[in-house]
A protein has these predicted regions:
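PAPS-dependent sulfotransferase catalytic core
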Residues: 1-121, 132-185, 190-192
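The conserved 3'-phosphoadenosine-5'-phosphosulfate
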Residues: 2, 6-19, 213-309, 313, ...
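Short glycine/proline-rich turn/loop motifs
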Residues: 47-49, 187-198, 285-300
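Non-transmembrane alpha-helical segments in soluble domains
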Residues: 69-73, 90, 101, 131, ...
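Short histidine/acidic/glycine/proline-rich micro-motifs that form metal-
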Residues: 87-89, 117-121, 201-202, 229-233, ...
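PAPS-dependent sulfotransferase catalytic domain
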Residues: 94-106, 163-256, 306
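Extended catalytic core of nucleotide-activated donor transferases of GT-like folds
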Residues: 120-125, 315
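Short aromatic-enriched loop/helix-cap "lid" or pocket-rim segments at secondary-structure transitions
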Residues: 126-127, 150-155, 161-162, 238-240, ...
Length: 329
C-alpha cells in the first residue's frame, strides 16, 4: 500500500474542505449578501509563499485542452490555481511576479500547480516571457487536425456572435488576403503581435510548425510534450499516463471520462476546484453547443487540406511523428 499517496490525497482533501467552507461563507445570501471577500487581498499578501506553475498547457485552442486540464487536476499531487486561464504572459506581464503567484496555491511539499491558457501557443512574444520567469517549466501542447480546428473555431465565433461573416468560405478568403499582404509587406508584422495571434486567424493558428519553432528557440524538446487531440478520445488512459510520466508524477487512475468535452461527467472536487469546474462547464457548454453546425463543404475541406499540407509535413519532420491529417475526410 502506498501510504505516501494516501497522505497526499488526505492533504488535498483537507485543503479542499477549507475552500468549501470559505466558498460557502462567501456565497451565503444572508451572511454575506454583497459577496464581499478578502480572497484577492489575502492572495496578494501571501503571494511570496505561493507556488509557480510546474507545467503549462499552452494550446492549441479548440483542441481539447479543457478536457485535458480537467483530467489532470484529478491527480492528488496537482492542485489547480484560482482559475484555469490566467493570461498573465499575454496581457499582464507589466504586473509583478507576485500578481501571478497570487493565482496559485500556497507551497506544499510534493504538490504542484499548473495553468492552461490555449492562446499562449500562437503568441509570438510569449515563449521568451515564459522562459524568463519559468525556464524549467514543462509545456504541454494538444494539436488537432488544423482543418477541423479552423472550422470549429469559426463556428464557435459564429455561435458567440463574434464573426463578421457567417460564411466560412468568405472568412477563409479574407484571411488569405491578410496572409498575402503580410508576406508582401513583412514590416506590418513588426511590433504587431496581433498579426499572428489575432482571434480571427483561424488558418494562422493552425500553422503549428511556425508556432512550435518559436517555442523551441527557448525550450529544449525534453520540456515539451505534444499530444494528438484525437487520442484524448480514442486512447485517453494511455495519454493521461504518458502525461503524468512526463510530469514525473506517480501513476494515478483518473475516475472521470469526458466525451466530446462534456465536463458534467467529471466528479467535482468542491471549493475553488468546484468553481473552476463551473467555469469550465459553462465555457465548454457555450463552445460545444455548436456541434450541430453544418458539415464543411467537401471542396472547402480539400482546399484547406492542400493549404495546410506543407505546414503539416514540416511539423511531422520537427516532432518525428506523423498524424493522419492530410488524408482525413
Amino acid at each position: 500500500m502506498n501510504t505516501r499517496k494516501f497522505k497526499l490525497s488526505d492533504e488535498k482533501k483537507r485543503s479542499t474542505q477549507r475552500r468549501v467552507v470559505r466558498s460557502w461563507l462567501i456565497e451565503h445570501p444572508e451572511l454575506n449578501p454583497y459577496k464581499f471577500t478578502w480572497d484577492r487581498f489575502y492572495r496578494k499578501i501571501t503571494s511570496r509563499f505561493r507556488m509557480l506553475p510546474s507545467f503549462l498547457i499552452i494550446g492549441g485552442s479548440r483542441s481539447g485542452t479543457t478536457s485535458l486540464f480537467a483530467h489532470l487536476i484529478e491527480h492528488p499531487n496537482i492542485i489547480p490555481g484560482s482559475m484555469k486561464e490566467v493570461y498573465f504572459f499575454q496581457y499582464f506581464t507589466n504586473n509583478k511576479t507576485s500578481f501571478y503567484r497570487s493565482h496559485f496555491p500556497i507551497k506544499r511539499k510534493n504538490l504542484i500547480t499548473c495553468e492552461s491558457t490555449s492562446n499562449y501557443f500562437v503568441h509570438p512574444l510569449i515563449p521568451a516571457r515564459v522562459h524568463k520567469l519559468l525556464p524549467s517549466v514543462k509545456l504541454i501542447v494538444v494539436l488537432r487536425n488544423p482543418v477541423e480546428r479552423a472550422y470549429s473555431e469559426f463556428q464557435k465565433k459564429v455561435n458567440l456572435g463574434e464573426q463578421i461573416t457567417e460564411n466560412f468560405e468568405d472568412d477563409i478568403k479574407s484571411e488569405l488576403k491578410r496572409i498575402e499582404i503580410g508576406n508582401k509587406k513583412p514590416e506590418l508584422k513588426i511590433g504587431n503581435t496581433n498579426y499572428d495571434q489575432f482571434s480571427f486567424s483561424h488558418l494562422r493558428h493552425g500553422l503549428y510548425a511556425q508556432h512550435l519553432e518559436k517555442w523551441l528557440k527557448f525550450f529544449p524538446k525534453e520540456q515539451l510534450l505534444i499530444l494528438h487531440a484525437k487520442d484524448l478520445y480514442d486512447n485517453l488512459d494511455n495519454i493521461i499516463a504518458e502525461t503524468f510520466e512526463f510530469l514525473n508524477l506517480p501513476k494515478y487512475q483518473i475516475e472521470s471520462r469526458i466525451e466530446k468535452n462534456k465536463i458534467d461527467k467529471i466528479r467535482p472536487l468542491g471549493g475553488h476546484e468546484r468553481n473552476i469546474y463551473k467555469n469550465i462547464d459553462s465555457k465548454t457548454r457555450t463552445l460545444f453547443n455548436v456541434q450541430n453546425y453544418p458539415e464543411m463543404k467537401s471542396e472547402t475541406r480539400k482546399f484547406l487540406q492542400d493549404f495546410f499540407r506543407p505546414y503539416n509535413e514540416k511539423l511531422f519532420e520537427m516532432i518525428g511523428r506523423r498524424f493522419d491529417w492530410n488524408d482525413e475526410k
